[in-house]
Amino acid sequence: FFQAEDGIRDRSPSRGLGDVYKRQYAQARIMPAERLVSLPDFIEDQQAAAMMLQGMTVEYLIRRTFSVQEGQTVLFHAIAGGVGLLACQWLKQMGAVVIGTAGSEEKAALASAHGCDHVIIYDHEDIVERVNEITDGAGVPVVYDSVGKDTWDASIASLQTRGVMVSFGASSGLPDNFSVNQLQFKGSLYVTRPTLLHYVATRSDLLGSANALFEAAKNGLKVDINQTFPLEDTALAHRALEARQTTGSTVLIT
């Protein structure tokens, strides 16, 4: 059942609606209509469930937090995850060179299949050495890091002068003993800790982000739904995520 607020005219009860609210596992939910977006006909409901939050996260990271330009080389950690695989495809649409990190040969192969130019298996290879090798010692202008503690030092060391460290998660914990003075000595670097909430705070920003995602999907961006769990097995889904046993996106089915 769909009931629109008074004055809301651009939502249709005959078509699916998407949102990017976090921490919600439910069969039905009361939502403010201004925080919903209409889904285009070519995006199925399960696709939308997998791609809205992760896809709009990628949108703000690569288009607004740091606006990646054609020909630039970027380092993106956890490239075989849901956000990483979407980012890889979208960055390739933009003409970027993508260096990704992954935790296994299987995940590296998955990233390569999605267009990643260079995959570093961080359990077996030195990230900084490989980045310097790939960039002829120049480093990268931006690093996207959702891992945190385990990759922080390598991320900072992989940046070129005045490079940007985009820390958008900390799956391994927060870095130890980080001092802003390091930014000066490492090359006048920038560090930012963005979150999607502040990039879709207005309806205009929300629609702009969603429409950019839908356009990328129309141009071939695909979401990999590699795991599905019944809603009652949510705990199993969390255990799989915590054990790093998942790739791509995970969807709960009601």
Model-derived segments and spans:
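Short, small-residue-biased leader/transition segments that mark boundaries at the very start
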Residues: 4-21
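NAD(P)H dinucleotide-binding glycine-rich loop of Rossmann-like/cofactor-binding domains
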Residues: 19-78
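NAD(P)H cofactor-binding loop motif with strongest signal on the N-terminal glycine-rich segment
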Residues: 78-79, 147
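N-terminal Rossmann NAD(P)H-binding glycine-rich loop of SDR-like oxidoreductase domains
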Residues: 80, 88
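Hydrophobic/small residue at the entry helix of a nucleotide-binding pocket
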Residues: 83
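Adenosine-nucleotide cofactor-binding segment
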Residues: 92-151, 202-205
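Glycine-rich phosphate-binding loop and adjacent beta-alpha segment
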Residues: 150-219, 254
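C-terminal hydrophobic helical "lid"/dimerization subdomain
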Residues: 203-254
